[in-house]
Structures are given as structure tokens and as C-alpha cells.
From Swiss-Prot:
Belongs to the Turandot family. Keywords: Immunity, Innate immunity, Secreted, Signal. The keyword Membrane does not apply. It holds the Pfam family Turandot. Its main location: secreted. A humoral factor that may play a role in stress tolerance. Transmembrane segments: none annotated. It is found in: Secreted. The gene is TotX. This is Protein Turandot X. Residues 1-24 form the signal peptide. The lineage of its organism: Eukaryota, Metazoa, Ecdysozoa, Arthropoda, Hexapoda. GO terms for cellular component: extracellular space. One of its GO terms (biological process) is response to bacterium. InterPro entries: Turandot.
């Protein structure tokens, strides 16, 4: 049985539309999550506690969109080490709860804070859709 060319072209068009729709949905999700991350980490009015509390969301964003985040190799290695260390620290339990304080406390005033700043800068710098701060080139 021969399938008419018209039916095949309609089927092909439908498949292309579905694939484009899925990609657009992923882009919208990326943009939404990126905006949330930038609202927290690119806003000087947000306190350190809020930034530290949102580190798991930052890590999840990095894991979900690794190809979209352009870090130099050295920063990427440091970031991967930070993620591994942070994840390990959250899995260690003390009296049935994750350990409090330790190396994660005041994380944003340390070299890890600088690494997070580089991560946020890469989101702003390499993505043309990200609004730049007032006065930025």
C-alpha cells in the first residue's frame, strides 16, 4: 500500500511542530529558572542567609542545564568540586539531620562565594537574553 506524499508531509510537519514545541517549553523553563536564580544572587538587597538557603536550587539549575552555562575549565572544575563537597555535607546526618554550620556557613564570604559569583556572571555574560545591570556595557 502506498501512502500519499501529502499524508507523509503532514505527518512530518506535525512531528516538527511537536519537537519545536518541546524545545520552546524547555527554553521557557530555563529562562524562568535563570531569572529566579538571578533575582536571588544578582540582587544586593538579598541577604546571605537567603543566598545560602538557595544553594541547592543553584546546584540543581547547574545540573539541569550544564551545556547552557559557559564557565572556563578551571572554574568548572572548582564548581564541580564545590557541588560534590556540598552534596556530601548535606548527606551526612547528625542526630538524623544534616550537619549545621561547618564549611558551608558564611559560604558567600569565602572563595566559594567568589565561585558562585563567577557562575552568576557567566549566566549574565554569555546569555544575550539576560538583562544587564544599569550602567553595564
Amino acid at each position: 500500500m502506498r501512502v500519499p506524499v501529502f499524508q507523509l508531509s503532514c505527518l512530518l510537519g506535525l512531528i516538527v511542530c511537536l519537537l519545536c514545541s518541546v524545545k520552546a517549553q524547555k527554553d521557557d523553563q530555563y529562562d524562568t529558572e535563570k531569572s529566579r536564580i538571578l533575582e536571588i544572587y544578582n540582587n544586593p538587597a538579598v541577604d546571605e542567609f537567603t543566598k545560602e538557603r538557595n544553594i541547592p536550587k543553584l546546584i540543581e539549575f547547574y545540573r539541569r542545564y550544564p551545556a547552557r552555562i559557559q564557565l572556563p575549565d578551571a572554574d568548572k572544575r572548582q564548581w564541580d568540586e564545590f557541588v560534590a563537597r556540598y552534596t556530601e555535607s548535606q548527606t551526612k546526618l547528625v542526630d538524623g539531620l544534616p550537619a549545621q554550620g561547618g564549611w558551608v556557613g558564611s559560604v558567600l564570604s569565602s572563595t566559594v562565594g567568589n565561585l558562585i559569583a563567577k557562575f552568576i556572571f557567566s549566566l549574565i555574560r554569555y546569555d544575550p537574553t539576560t538583562p544587564k545591570p544599569i550602567g553595564a556595557p
